[in-house]
Amino acid sequence: MLRILCLALCSLLTGTRADPGALLRLGMDIMNQVQSAMDESHILEKMAAEAGKKQPGMKPIKGITNLKVKDVQLPVITLNFVPGVGIFQCVSTGMTVTGKSFMGGNMEIIVALNITATNRLLRDEETGLPVFKSEGCEVILVNVKTNLPSNMLPKMVNKFLDSTLHKVLPGLMCPAIDAVLVYVNRKWTNLSDPMPVGQMGTVKYVLMSAPATTASYIQLDFSPVVQQQKGKTIKLADAGEALTFPEGYAKGSSQLLLPATFLSAELALLQKSFHVNIQDTMIGELPPQTTKTLARFIPEVAVAYPKSKPLTTQIKIKKPPKVTMKTGKSLLHLHSTLEMFAARWRSKAPMSLFLLEVHFNLKVQYSVHENQLQMATSLDRLLSLSRKSSSIGNFNERELTGFITSYLEEAYIPVVNDVLQVGLPLPDFLAMNYNLAELDIVENALMLDLKLG
């Protein structure tokens, strides 16, 4: 019984993927989006407008009536990472509090203050999305000026100001912090939505666990879900080595790391789109695609077809495409069959001449367009060529190496590049503009150095 339990446990462990399929590191450059969120939401001004309205259940402030808040200064936000927690936030701002004082005259208090809070970064259990939650909000008075008469007893003035401000400001400012975080959290909303890869399937960036915070950055580990249109999930291959960020990037900067295994899984969605049936006789710089041209490389073709016939070529990718990466260079490996047919008269089906198995590599260049990862390829080299069947007898397929190489370059690779124009989706978070990113091919991964512009 114990042995059965052990076997069951081992099978569960081996079936669980613990390694992330993509990594996102957010430095302070990106997290300063909190500043823009406060600017965009105009939350302080809105809170100030609400301050003068009677709120249900709120007791009037003793000694002041007709309370209003105006002249709210543009806030300056300072952020610091708190390891294991999230972000410590300090908002420096100023405003003017007006009203009727207990002495009967108009009162004006000019306040400079700091609002501090810890924004804990969590993973929402229901949505699986990152979420900021504020805690420990405090309002610290930096400077206070008032138009109250100078002949009043200082202790009385200070006591009144202290009582008034500590009643008004926390209720005004701390909800502003929460409201800004709600605004920021909305910018995570689309992160785990399925995004299309053409019409062949979708990619979804699923957060594996709560984001990890260090003294320099926040890291998010993703387990991307690559799913075919019919619902079948494509598993990421085992990378063999743990996915880690390379050294040498500026402190406080932000990067996205996409491993070659993940890109391979995405391209597997497009495998059938790489199948082609080419019937054109004239293609680019190639000689006419006829049996006469083919006979220059295989004399047996001239014997079987004394009169020249048009050729049709069918290429099918037999294994899922595989992306590999070494520093500075990325290759796309394609294992295919290439079958050539000769046309026949009277609407008869073309006759198969031969079937080859072809393994070749394409060099890959990466770019970003409209927030999609783009790939453009060119032939690296033809790796192997083997004959599987032939209707024209035995021949030395190596004699076709130059012919097939030119054919791939002129006829097939343009088809591959057309298919790749669908683009590969990138994580949708904080309204990130990937078009500004700098791309680097590192060991086993593609690095996007994110920029705000």
UniProtKB/Swiss-Prot annotation:
Molecular function in Gene Ontology: lipid binding
Signal peptide coordinates: 1-18
UniProt-listed InterPro entries: Bactericidal_perm-incr_a/b_dom, BPI_fold-BPI/LBP, Lipid-bd_serum_glycop_C, Lipid-bd_serum_glycop_N
Swiss-Prot/TrEMBL keywords: Disulfide bond, Glycoprotein, Secreted, Signal
One matching Pfam family: LBP_BPI_CETP
Tissue expression from the record: Detected at very low levels in normal tonsils, and at higher levels in hypertrophic tonsils.
Localization of this protein: Secreted
GO cellular component: extracellular region
Glycan-bearing residues: N114, N190
Disulphide-bridged cysteine pairs: C137-C174
Record annotation: effect of changing R296H: De novo variant found in a patient with intellectual disability
Family of the protein in this entry: Belongs to the BPI/LBP/Plunc superfamily. BPI/LBP family.
Protein name: BPI fold-containing family B member 6
Species of the source: Homo sapiens
GN (gene name): BPIFB6
